[in-house]
Amino acid sequence: MATKKYGVNELREMFLSFFESKGHLRLPSFSLIPQNDASLLLINSGMAPMKPYFKGEVTPPRRRVCTCQKCIRTGDIDNIGHTARHGTYFEMLGNFSFGDYFKHEAIAWCWEFLTKICGLEEDRLYPSIYENDDEAFEIWNKEIGIPADRIFRFGKEDNFWEHGSGPCGPCSEVYYDRGEKYGCGKPGCTVGCDCDRYMEIWNNVFSQFDNDGHGNYTDLVQKNIDTGMGLERLAVACQDVDSLFDVDTVMNITHKVTEITGAHYGMSHEKDVSLRVITDHIRASVFMISDGVLPSNEGRGYVLRRLLRRAARHGKLLGVDHPFLCDVVETVIHENEGHYPDLRERAAYITRVVRVEEENFARTIDGGMRIFSEMLAQHKENNESVFSGADAFKLYDTYGFPIDLTVEMAREEGMEVDLEAFRKLMQEQKVRAREARKALGDLGWAGIDFGQDIPETQFVGYDKNETEGTVLAIVAEDESRSEIAAGVEAIVVLDRTTMYAEMGGQVADHGTITGPDGVFEVTDVQKNKGGKFMHYGRVVSGTIKLGEACKIMIDPERRAAIRRAHTATHLLQAALLRVLGEHCHQAGSLVEPDHLRFDFTHFSAVTPEELVEIGNQVSEMVLHGEPDETMVLPIAEAQKLGATALFGEKYGETVRVVKMGEDSLEFCGGTHLDNTAKVGPFRILSEASVASGVRRIEAYTGKEVLRQTEQMSRLLLDIAHELKTTPKELMQRAHAMVSEVKELKQRLDAMKDKLFSGEIDRCLFAAREVGGLKVLTVMRNDIAPNDLRKMGDQIRDREPDAVAVLASTQGEKITLLAVCGKNAVGRGIKAGQLIKEVSAACGGSGGGKPDSAMGGGRDLLKLDDALAGVDDFVTTHLA
């Protein structure tokens, strides 16, 4: 246990500040979404975002860096809530060296931080090393002073880090003894035991060898350090609590869950598990959503959906029958916003995403509840004491109803579920799916395999809005289904469709699939490698069954808006070629309803005059009303006609070519208008750089231009009314106001300078002499940080012997500035060190350069004492 029970937020700052004092650059946490790393779904360690630095692909901003990295791991999801060690979301503290310091410094600083900064008892800390790493043993034993019998040697499996060929090396871990009550009671229980007594809190990886892939190791020229320490695990040790769920910031989230659910720790093991699952999963979900992940049926979106639905399901087990996770979001944000201010900025968005997902899941559950009640009534009518496995399987398979909820609800009615029969049916379904895959069917998009017996989907939607087809496959929850009911989200594959799948930058159509007994609402369409169109959506009424005939109908308004934007995209490319030159190649595009984004190669920013001309040319082509002609031609013939292809794209033997009058001829598989006149109004929204040599234009068409125009007109009228003028004279009024504000600001700055000059004279006159230096502390209300800095700079520049701390309070916020004249700095007084002490004394933090440093505090009641300590600081630190 530490000498003081530091909070999670304190420990994070202590770690980062400590390594800053050791010359490390503090980097903010990287996003949970990996950047340019296809090997990871989500960032799962502090080292993961550092890979480009370790591999030499990117030059690090400094050879020493430290981070507190957000991480997600879902491999142990079934253990969440049952153990003290497992959590989906955690923060990983890490210090890294890229060819700078090595074992001596890494081990020494590790020990210093744990014992001197955190105050953990030395006799409860045990280092482990790789069995052959005598160098690490000598450092721990001789330099740190750990007795040999307290240093544990382990083999490659535990204490040697490598991943195939490439850089690798031994590691040294530090374990914390939590005490006998957490042990397994076995006589041989010691470091390395699987029980909860000895908890690994820090791992130092010494990357010093290169593995050639054949078991041969050579020394690396540049040796690196990669360390990791779980912030929550450190807090468990420092706060002397039972588990990750008992540390302060996490427990505060649990308190909110308790307040909503009425369940308390200790009521039962099952309720304790549910409270922990909800706490862990909503914590992870908030950070994932903030970093840009949205619930979906694939990839990291599926991870998020599973976490939210699992948490909602445990809410059901605690008796909550309404969306409640959205009410916990605020507490998660409150506990973490100090270090992650982006959470507060996105609070409304995060809450909305969580609420919508809860509501969608509730609809699934509600539909299953009704069917469960009908099944239950039938069982009771037959005087049965066991709820059949077949019914439980149907609830799960057709309605997406979780089996553990079925078990819970059946028990409430005095019945047990035949789980053996349920598992048998589940196994049979898996066997059927496995046998279907043996047909060597093509690998579907998102890993979905439909088999060779299902033909390619025939797209018939270029010239019609509706058609009739047959349901060939249904997939829900990653498994094939024969039937889906209302509320179930699924993928439906048809033999033919009018709905365009997302391709070539054009978004998918939306619409409906209507069967004899139900309606499936389509919100996305994707085409897999085998040519199947996968219709993503949800059953909104009745049921949809495999093999039944159905009517497919697109949303005609959405299709028309997409056509307007896509046709305008072709006209825009033609205008770019004419205005900017033939070097302009398409580098990417996005076509949405009445909105387009077009990336193109160009060596410089498009000038305002060029942009106006491009917009005018598109509008001219629209007004001309050129007919749209579509042809399917051999690729050689299309190229002979001069059709524009997407640079670097591979095409088949035949291609679809879209011609618009004499202005545009392009390879294209998208949907278009039959005449350019139907594009309607066209307006360029913006032009910007997206990469070196690549520019991007965004534009609106049709109804969106009308909506934007109306909105802008209304805004102009409102602004003119507010400024008591007319829209026509608005610019003149704005110029006058800008000039007036500029003049007033100059006068205000002059008055401030005069006031500051007088204030500084008074401050310097009242300065205290300490060791030959002039020490002064000044406290004022409502001075802006910039003004405080100006005042400090003048004091420092006018008096070389000055040591000053200036404080400004605005509400409960304290802004602090320390400045030191050149003589004071020369005598060992550093503003950065001074501001750290003063800030910490009033509940905050700070830092900076030797002659000027900024900080802040949160406890107004401690400000006077903090300022009173400046004289002692000067006396102590004088050289």
Report each predicted region and the residues it spans.
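A glycine- and charged-residue-rich anion-binding loop/surface
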Residues: 1-879
